[in-house]
Amino acid sequence: MAYQSSVKLRGLSLNCDIGSYGMNEVLPNKHRLDMELLVEKNLILIEEDKMANVFDYDPLVEDITQISLSGKFNTQEKLITLILKACLKYYQIKAVSLFLYKTPVREDGELGIAVSISEQELKKLREQLL
């Protein structure tokens, strides 16, 4: 099913320790997350202004924050995998796109990894992992 409604988060700074760097390499000072969570329209277009009628993203953001602080990561891939697993707990999320990136790369660039998980893939992951 194609969803045209989503919750988007852009540029969330994560205080995490990822990778190892040599003496002459530029150390990233920021790791950031962009996230798009596809949800049903009835969680976006509401009649009554009540939190019970929407997807409360604050607990997920807190989960992501705690994951990012949980220790040293060798790769961005491991961190994005754990973030995806955190998304699985929230059944209002029907599909998800994640982009985790670091800056600076070579003084002024950004570099990251992205993953998009469809509704069918998310359902299979939930069945396997939860």
Regions found by a protein language model. Name each.
Residues 1-130:
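N-terminal, polar/charged subdomain of small-to-medium soluble alpha/beta proteins
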